[in-house]
């Protein structure tokens, strides 16, 4: 028998998160976004020079995400995964910038004059 000539069919399984895990992740994402908004508010209250540009970037990103949410289910699953990942990355990156800016301002203002 020629075993080498037979096509081997492999079953591919994909891992899917349970509804409870998805809900937990959504809650964590919402909490992270609220903290990001709080950090942005800190920059506003401290009258920093970085606030206007970070606020503009945040607002534009949220507007884009909102618009995408309105059409998300009209695109195929692979495109959804790609764009979802892109928005998660962009939000995470921007929120990291906001957090860093807030920490830098707070540390600078807490340092003793030399």
Predicted segments, located by residue:
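Bacterial signal peptide processing site
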Residues: 6-9
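C-terminal motif of bacterial Sec signal peptides marking the signal peptidase cleavage site
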Residues: 2-4
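Sec-dependent signal peptide cleavage junction
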Residues: 11-19
